[in-house]
Amino acid sequence: MSRYRGPRVKIIRRPGVSPGLTSKTLKSKSNYIDRSTSNKKVSQYRVRLEEKQKLRFHYGLTERQLLKYVRIARKAKGSTGQVLLQLLEMRLDNTIFRLGMAPTIPGARQLVNHGHISMNNNIIDIPSYNREPGDIITIRNKLESRSMISKNINLFQKLKMPSHLSFDLTGLQGSVNQMVNREWVNLKINELLVVEYYSRQV
């Protein structure tokens, strides 16, 4: 299954709030049905599927990519669900978004793909590149790169930055201070349901 490229607001309404997918503010719809107040019974498979889709759409992953991350998380020490979130949060594209350098994760991915980002003085064009404590993320010394990202920073750095990251406004560079903790994940998700969804595939 390929990465979703359709209307983002439509997707957000379906699985729930996904702050990394769009910077738009949703308007409530009068015909929206809240499952918590509906009498219709929802299967456990449906619940797990929707949590999985929420996670996949938020981080902009293909089905194959998410399954790969789940398999890696299962082999690691600790809670599989929390390790999975940690792997996704420490991706380069998500880190750029959380630093306020891009309005959305898709926007951050585009910055990386177009070569606007350097990491530890090396140009990185792989959005899935995994971050580690001590990594320094900078903007390439090009007028186009610095102008574009400076504009994003002015607009989106008002949002609360997670404690595992920091940003130097003077030098226009971000730092990864430590591995992300569960409470710093900016997504309402039950990661255990995602792990359960993939239980027969890993």
Curated annotation (Swiss-Prot):
Q: Where is the signal peptide?
A: none
Q: Does the keyword Chloroplast apply?
A: yes
Q: What is this protein called?
A: Small ribosomal subunit protein uS4c
Has the keyword Metal-binding been applied to this entry? no
A GO term from the CC aspect: chloroplast
What does the protein in this record do? One of the primary rRNA binding proteins, it binds directly to 16S rRNA where it nucleates assembly of the body of the 30S subunit. With S5 and S12 plays an important role in translational accuracy.
Q: How does it assemble?
A: Part of the 30S ribosomal subunit. Contacts protein S5. The interaction surface between S4 and S5 is involved in control of translational fidelity.
Q: Where is the S4 RNA-binding domain?
A: 90-153
UniProt keyword list:
Chloroplast, Plastid, Ribonucleoprotein, Ribosomal protein, RNA-binding, rRNA-binding
> Locations of Polar residues compositional bias?
20-37
What SUPFAM superfamilies does its record include? Answer: Alpha-L RNA-binding motif (SSF55174)
CDD domains assigned to the protein according to its UniProt record, in alphabetical order: S4
Q: What is its main location?
A: plastid
